[in-house]
Amino acid sequence: MADFLQDKVAIITGAGRGVGRGVAQLMAKEGARVIVVDPGVNVDGSGFDQSIAEQVAQEINQAGGTAIACTESVVTMEGGERIIQTAIDNFGKLDIVVTCAGILRDRMIFNMSEQEWDDVISVHLKGTFTVVKNACILFRQQRSGKIITFSSQSGLVGNSGQANYGAA
């Protein structure tokens, strides 16, 4: 392990799979104590499997890092509050928030339901807001903190069947 992020505490949303998982693993390798946030939903947002976040946290711990799993959802303000509180309760502080949570509900817009639109917007857009807002309250008190938000090129280029994803 390196020490670039030694003694930093980082929350990574969407850390159960994909980019978020890679970010969590790299930050832990660099010395951060990591909160792996992921409710373990399928790529379309359905289901729930708390073992997804637990598995990533276990892998990080086995590799010599420090990580805990958090299965809270980012889609409610209360979930965002609980995610931030998880860092405080377990590590006494928070230094970095990385938002990578995302789902897909691909469908041509003329066939897309309002619920499919809302579900993607809730995770990508509102999910960023709920976590970042609550982190900023703490960061303001601490007088320090870093926020990293991920997006997709779909917001710039667009993909067929991903109007909701691109908008988010």
Residue ranges and their predicted role:
Residues 152:
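Residue(s) in the substrate-gating loop at a strand-loop-helix junction
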Residues 108-109, 116-121:
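Substrate-binding pocket helix/loop in short-chain dehydrogenase/reductase
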